[in-house]
């Protein structure tokens, strides 16, 4: 059975919700799925003052965990058009995995959230995807089999490069059903690819 890791960072819970939807899709495909988050690097008092969601269920990942999976689906919110520093710091600590080729041939994908519709979703996805390509993974995006990313009757996330959500400038907007459907779809497609490649 293919093993899938959904690895995410979320300050306010939007990507926690998306991670759970991605995991649902991967499980529907028949994969064994774990959800983990990267360590918070913001000092606790500052995180509390900024009202970060600190009670997230997912255990904190260790860099070495990545080698145990057939597929790794990575989610991080945008920070000025690139992945949040918490996720970047996690990857920066993974040089040992890169040096020994521990992730070569694994399947990977990316998902993100932004404050606005044009707030850097695709550049953030590319910042994650670039890292995963350097680690030797095979990238699976959100193909147009998820027709919801073509809709024009609502403001919605979704890109061929990965599932996305729009949080709103004050973080009050939660992932829509269309965005969650896209996340489940991408999770399923990545798991199906991992099953084909790794059994």
Swiss-Prot record:
UniProt-listed Enzyme Commission number(s): 1.6.5.2
Coiled-coil region: none
Positions with a binding annotation for substrate: 98
Pfam families in UniProt: FMN_red (PF03358)
A GO cellular-component term linked to this record: membrane
Cofactor binding note from Swiss-Prot or TrEMBL: Binds 1 FMN per monomer.
Source organism superkingdom: Bacteria
Binding site for FMN: 10-15, 78-80, 113-119, 134
Residues where NAD(+) binds: 12
Keyword Lipoprotein belongs to the record: no
GO molecular function annotation: flavin adenine dinucleotide binding; FMN binding; NAD binding; NADH:ubiquinone reductase (non-electrogenic) activity; NADP binding; NADPH dehydrogenase (quinone) activity
Cofactor(s) for this UniProt protein: FMN
Reaction equation(s) it catalyzes: a quinone + NADH + H(+) = a quinol + NAD(+); a quinone + NADPH + H(+) = a quinol + NADP(+)
Signal peptide extent: none
Start and end residues of each Flavodoxin-like domain: 4-190
Keyword annotations: Flavoprotein, FMN, NAD, NADP, Nucleotide-binding, Oxidoreductase
PANTHER family: FLAVODOXIN-RELATED PROTEIN WRBA-RELATED, FLAVOPROTEIN-LIKE PROTEIN YCP4-RELATED
Family named by the database record: Belongs to the WrbA family.
Name by which UniProt lists this protein: NAD(P)H dehydrogenase (quinone)
Organism of this sequence: Caulobacter vibrioides (strain NA1000 / CB15N)
């Amino acid at each position: 059975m293919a093993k899938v890791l959904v690895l995410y960072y979320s300050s306010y819970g939007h990507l926690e919700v998306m991670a759970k939807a991605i995991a649902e899709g991967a499980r529907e495909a028949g994969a064994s799925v774990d959800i983990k988050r990267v360590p918070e690097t913001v000092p606790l008092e500052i995180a509390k003052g900024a009202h970060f969601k600190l009670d997230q269920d997912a255990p904190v990942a260790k860099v070495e965990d990545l080698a145990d999976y057939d597929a790794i689906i990575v989610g991080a919110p945008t920070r000025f058009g690139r992945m949040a520093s918490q996720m970047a710091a996690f990857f920066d600590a993974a040089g040992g995995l890169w040096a020994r080729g521990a992730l070569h041939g694994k399947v990977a994908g990316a998902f993100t959230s932004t404050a606005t519709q044009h707030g850097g979703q695709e550049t953030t996805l590319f910042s994650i995807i670039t890292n995963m390509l350097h680690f030797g993974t095979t990238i699976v995006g959100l193909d147009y089999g998820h027709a919801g990313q073509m809709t024009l009757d609502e403001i919605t996330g979704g890109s061929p490069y990965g599932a996305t959500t729009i949080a709103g400038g004050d973080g009050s907007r939660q992932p829509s059903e269309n965005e969650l459907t896209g996340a489940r779809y991408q999770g399923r497609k990545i798991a199906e690819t991992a099953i084909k490649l790794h059994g």
